[in-house]
Regions:
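AMP-binding/adenylate-forming catalytic core of the ANL superfamily
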Residues: 77, 98, 105-106, 115, ...
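Gly/Ser/Thr-rich phosphate-binding loop
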Residues: 278-281, 291-357, 369
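Conserved pre-ATP/AMP-binding loop-to-beta segment of ANL
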Residues: 153-190, 197, 222-230
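Conserved AMP-binding A3 loop
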Residues: 41-43, 177-180, 186-213
Length: 542
C-alpha cells in the first residue's frame, strides 16, 4: 500500500480530522488508546489507520462515499473512523444496537457504499441489501487469553460472520489520495431522534476539530498536565460528545482515550486506582450510576482533575454529591456542566474549574457567540429569557437532504453572521454565564438521547387496534421515562393483548430509551379547548 508522496511528505492534510492525529504521531510516541488493559501507541494507531484505509480503498471507497459504522467504542472502530476520514469518505456513525429495519432506511437515505458492524451483530444485519457488509471486531486488540476465548465465548453471536472481517481484505496496490479539504462534508450524525426517520446532521472536519482546539482554554493552567493523561472514552461515537470530546480531543492534545465498549464500573475503578485517568466525561444517567457504585469513593480519585457533564438536564443533587465525594478524598476535581448540540458537534459552552457558577452551563468558547432572541427574532438583554442562538466555527453544514429544515434552523443575520437556532430557552446573566430554562422544541431527553413523542405516536397509530395515542415524558429525577396512553378502536378489544402488541412493535423499531415504560389503555384522551390532546392532564394521570 502507498499514499500520495506529496501529501504524506508535506502533511498537506494536517487540518483534517485524521491529519491532526497523523501529524501528532510524528512528534509523540506515547499511549493513544487503552482498551481492556492493553495500551496502543500513536505509532500503532497510525499504522492501523493506514492499513484500514488501504483495505477500504481496495473495496472501492473513495472521496465523498458514505461508510456507515455501527459498532461500540473499540479500537477497530477508531481505526475505521479515522481511515474513512483519511481518504475523504464520509463517516456515518450510528447506534451499534440500531434495529435492522431502521438501519436499512438510514443506509438508503445516505446512499451508503459500505456498512461496518460489530462481528457479534452480523447475523442481525446480514440480510440488508443496500450495500456490502463487513465486520470489525475487538479480537485483534485483546490480550492473548481473551483473544483465544473470544470465538468460543461469542460462538452463537458470531455465527455466519466468518469471511466478512474487514481485516481479511487485501491491501490496495493503488496509491491512496489523502483528503486535504477540511470544509467538505465528512461526518453524518443523527440529530438524536428515536428512529431512523430523524434528521441527519452534516459536519465537516473544521467542526469536529474545534473542541480539541479549545482544550487548553477549558483546562487553563492545568493544561500542562494534559500530555499523556487519560480521558475516559466510553460515550459512543454516534454521539457528538463521545466522538469529539471522548475520542478525538484527547488525541489532538497528546493525551490518551480510554475506550470502553459498554459502561463497566469495575474497569473504570481499575483505571482510577491505577491513576491513569485524569478526565471524565459523562451524561447524567451515567453520573448517577457512578455515584451509586463504589468507583468514585476511593482515595485514588485524587488523581482526577476534571469531570464534564452534558447532553441532558442534570439534577443539582448530582453536582453536590459528586463534589462532596471528591472533597472527601482530597481531589480537586469537580463536576462541570457544559452545553452544546449535534448541530455544533457537541459542547461550545462550559463551566471551568476556575470560572464557574452553580446552575449555569458556563461561558462560551472564545470564538463562540451567543445571543438570546424573542419570538420575533429581536435580541434580548441580559437576564431576559428567550431562544438561545449560537454562532461558532463548528456549526453544522445543515441537514442531509432537508433544505427546509436547514434554512429554518441555520440563519444568517444582516451582518453575515451564521447562527443556529437551538430551540432551547434560556438567558445570559451579567457575568456572561448561560442558564438553560427548558426546551422550546417538542422533544425531551432520556439518558442523553433526544426522544421525539411524534415518532412514538406515529408508529403506534399504525398498529392494529389503536385509534389514537399520546406519548408523554415523566420527569422523574431518579428515573425519567415515557408513558404512552392509547385509545383503542374497539370497546371489545383485549387490552392486555393490545399493550403487548404495541410494546413488541415499538421495541423492534425504537431505541430502548424511547420505548414507553408504561402503556395505558384509556377510554378517552383528554382534549384542550382547541381540540388538541391535553398532555398536561395525561402527565397528571401517571
Amino acid at each position: 500500500m502507498s499514499f500520495s508522496n506529496k501529501e504524506e511528505k508535506g502533511m498537506a492534510f494536517e487540518n483534517t480530522v485524521w491529519g491532526r492525529i497523523a501529524l501528532i504521531s510524528t512528534r509523540h510516541h506515547g499511549v493513544a488508546l487503552r482498551f481492556r488493559g492493553k495500551e496502543f501507541s500513536y505509532d500503532y494507531l497510525k499504522d492501523q489507520v493506514d492499513k484500514y484505509a488501504s483495505r477500504l480503498y481496495n473495496l472501492g471507497i473513495r472521496k465523498d462515499d458514505v461508510v456507515c459504522i455501527a459498532a461500540p467504542n473499540i479500537p477497530s472502530s477508531i481505526f475505521a473512523m479515522y481511515a474513512v476520514n483519511s481518504i475523504g469518505a464520509i463517516n456515518f456513525i450510528v447506534h451499534p444496537l440500531i434495529p435492522a429495519k431502521a438501519l436499512e432506511e438510514d443506509l438508503k437515505k445516505t446512499k451508503a457504499k459500505l456498512l461496518l458492524v460489530l462481528d457479534q451483530r452480523y447475523s442481525i444485519y446480514k440480510d440488508i441489501k443496500q450495500c456490502p457488509i463487513y465486520t470489525i471486531s475487538p479480537k485483534n486488540e485483546l490480550s492473548p487469553i481473551e483473544d483465544f476465548f473470544y470465538p468460543i465465548a461469542y460462538a452463537s453471536k458470531l455465527k455466519g460472520s466468518k469471511g466478512h472481517d474487514l481485516t481479511s481484505v487485501p491491501f490496495t496496490k493503488e496509491p491512496i489520495e489523502r483528503n486535504t479539504d477540511e470544509y467538505k462534508p465528512s461526518f453524518y450524525l443523527q440529530s438524536g431522534g428515536t428512529t431512523g426517520k430523524n434528521k441527519i446532521v452534516v459536519l465537516n472536519d473544521r467542526a469536529v476539530n474545534y473542541q480539541g482546539e479549545n482544550v487548553a482554554w477549558i483546562l487553563g493552567d492545568q493544561y500542562r498536565y494534559c500530555k499523556g493523561s487519560g480521558m475516559l472514552g466510553f460515550l459512543p461515537m454516534f454521539h457528538g460528545f463521545g466522538l469529539a470530546m471522548g475520542v478525538h480531543a484527547p488525541l489532538t492534545n497528546y493525551a490518551t482515550s480510554d475506550l470502553m465498549a459498554t459502561y463497566n464500573e469495575k474497569e473504570i475503578g481499575k483505571l482510577i486506582k491505577a491513576r491513569k485517568l485524569r478526565y471524565l466525561i459523562v451524561v447524567p444517567y451515567l453520573a448517577k450510576r457512578m455515584l451509586k457504585g463504589k468507583t468514585l469513593n476511593d482515595p485514588s480519585v485524587s488523581n482526577l482533575t476534571h469531570a464534564f457533564i452534558g447532553a441532558d438536564k442534570t439534577n443539582p443533587t448530582v453536582f453536590t454529591e459528586f463534589d462532596s465525594i471528591m472533597e472527601k478524598n482530597n481531589s480537586k476535581c469537580r463536576l462541570l456542566e457544559g452545553y452544546g448540540l449535534t448541530e455544533t458537534v457537541t459542547v461550545v459552552v462550559v463551566n471551568r474549574i476556575f470560572d464557574r457558577k452553580p446552575g449555569s452551563v458556563g461561558k462560551p468558547f472564545p470564538d463562540v457567540k451567543l445571543k438570546v432572541i424573542d419570538e420575533n427574532g429581536n435580541t434580548l438583554s441580559t437576564n431576559q429569557s428567550g431562544q438561545i442562538c449560537i454562532s461558532a466555527p463548528c456549526l453544522a453544514l445543515g441537514y442531509l437532504n432537508d433544505k427546509e429544515a436547514t434554512d429554518k434552523t441555520f440563519v444568517t443575520d444582516e451582518n453575515g453572521i451564521r447562527w443556529v437556532l437551538t430551540g432551547d430557552e434560556g438567558y445570559i446573566d451579567e457575568d456572561g454565564f448561560l442558564f438553560i430554562k427548558g426546551r422550546i422544541k417538542d422533544m425531551f431527553k432520556i439518558a442523553g438521547f433526544n426522544i421525539f413523542p411524534a415518532d412514538i405516536e406515529d408508529m403506534t397509530n399504525k398498529i392494529e387496534g389503536v385509534e389514537n395515542c399520546a406519548a408523554v415524558y415523566i420527569e422523574n429525577p431518579n428515573h425519567p421515562y415515557v408513558h404512552l396512553f392509547i385509545k383503542s378502536d374497539s370497546k371489545n378489544i383485549d387490552t392486555s393483548e393490545l399493550v403487548k402488541r404495541v410494546r413488541e412493535n415499538l421495541s423492534n423499531e425504537l431505541i430502548k430509551y424511547a420505548v414507553p415504560e408504561k402503556i395505558t389503555v384509556i377510554d378517552k384522551l383528554p382534549l384542550t379547548n382547541v381540540g388538541k390532546i391535553d398532555k398536561k392532564k395525561l402527565i397528571e394521570l401517571d
